């Protein structure tokens, strides 16, 4: 077997070739450009070896390797992706202090040259790029939600200054009327000084289920007696922040439609679990990647970073530890977002949660136990392509 280690860069990459049987570097590290000409140069150097006797490895970091990875997969080469922490740890274990691109290619070959039982890489496949698109969309959704929460917090700060009583007038925040009033007036002072007919226009909305108990007259009355201060700076911020929030909502709607298309296309059995939506199901599948890369449930639990952290020394054993929080933070976030609906809609999970609470576990700890149980079920469903049936759970 010929091992080819590729160190990825923005404008150029380095590669070397190692003979796995002898451990000899048969082609010293050399660079090639990150373009078609450079890719052809790489193929020219390795096409003398049968494809089934070649294993190519590269670090799974950033995005600079995507074009090369897809190019090699389309040519039906076997490509292994390696966690950068693995190569860094391997270099340090060998006493390596110096780090450069040429030495990194050899280090990658060393990682590839591990027994099958202890392999520290995963084989990539052409269909992984379908999951890549889904992962980018679901991560973009997560990031937009975080951005929206920042804007909403800033908006609430501004409202507390110019109209502290405003939120008490509504059963829920960010409704159509709620946003219309903020966009149009921005403060209690502006509402109090505005003709009632103009205020009524903010309440004119179409569709069923959009009616609220608040009236324009009641709003104006509260604005007149408000303790809010007059601030043109806060009014400008409110108008800008409401516009940003509405823009993000439009973007999220567009993303949700595309994610639902992907979810229907995936037709995954994990959607049969009550509490898992199109978005959360797609996010879980995209973050996990190809399920064939995992041989047991504990591996995806570890990948999600929800395995309990165990610390034991010769005379010390920690009784209370947190989860590891390694791996995909997006997967971990999705799991903790959906676990409460799963517990609520599934009697087996609800019983398991109550059991952990009765054993003295805290709410967050009991959630963690349920998350790990959910991952074990997801692993089984994906491996067997079986629909969820709560009657089969123990």
How would you name each of these model-derived features?
Residues 1-394:
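A detector of single, family-specific signature residues
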């Amino acid at each position: 077997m010929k091992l080819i280690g590729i160190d990825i860069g923005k404008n150029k990459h380095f590669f070397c070739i190692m003979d796995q049987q002898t451990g000899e570097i048969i082609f010293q590290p050399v660079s090639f450009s990150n373009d078609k000409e450079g890719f052809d140069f790489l193929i020219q150097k390795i096409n003398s070896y049968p494809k089934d006797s070649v294993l190519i490895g590269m670090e799974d970091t950033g995005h600079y390797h995507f074009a090369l990875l897809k190019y090699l997969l389309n040519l039906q080469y076997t490509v292994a992706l390696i966690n950068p922490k693995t190569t860094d740890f391997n270099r340090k274990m060998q006493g390596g202090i110096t780090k450069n691109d040429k030495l990194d290619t050899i280090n990658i070959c060393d990682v590839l040259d591990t027994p099958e039982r202890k392999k520290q890489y995963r084989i990539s496949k052409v269909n992984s790029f379908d999951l890549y698109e889904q992962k980018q969309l679901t991560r973009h959704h997560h990031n937009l939600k975080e951005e929206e929460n920042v804007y909403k917090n800033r908006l609430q700060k501004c409202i507390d200054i110019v109209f502290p009583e405003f939120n008490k007038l509504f059963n829920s925040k960010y409704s159509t009327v709620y946003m219309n009033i903020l966009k149009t007036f921005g403060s209690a002072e502006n509402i109090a000084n505005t003709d009632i007919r103009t205020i009524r226009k903010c309440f004119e909305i179409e569709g069923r289920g959009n009616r609220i108990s608040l009236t324009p007259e009641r709003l104006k009355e509260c604005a007149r007696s408000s303790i809010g201060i007059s601030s043109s700076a806060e009014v400008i911020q409110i108008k800008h922040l409401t516009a940003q929030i509405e823009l993000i909502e439009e973007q999220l709607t567009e993303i949700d439609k595309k994610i639902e298309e992907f979810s229907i296309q995936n037709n995954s059995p994990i959607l049969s679990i009550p509490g898992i939506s199109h978005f959360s199901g797609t996010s879980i599948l995209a973050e996990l990647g190809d399920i064939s890369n995992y041989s047991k449930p504990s591996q995806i639990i570890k990948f999600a970073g929800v395995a309990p952290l165990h610390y034991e020394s010769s005379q010390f054993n920690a009784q209370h530890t947190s989860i590891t929080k390694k791996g995909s933070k997006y997967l971990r976030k999705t799991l903790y977002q959906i676990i409460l609906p799963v517990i609520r809609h599934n009697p087996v999970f609800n019983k398991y949660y109550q059991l952990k609470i009765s054993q003295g576990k805290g709410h967050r700890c009991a959630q963690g136990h349920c998350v790990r149980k959910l991952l074990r079920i997801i692993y089984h469903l994906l491996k067997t392509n079986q629909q969820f049936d709560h009657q089969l759970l123990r």
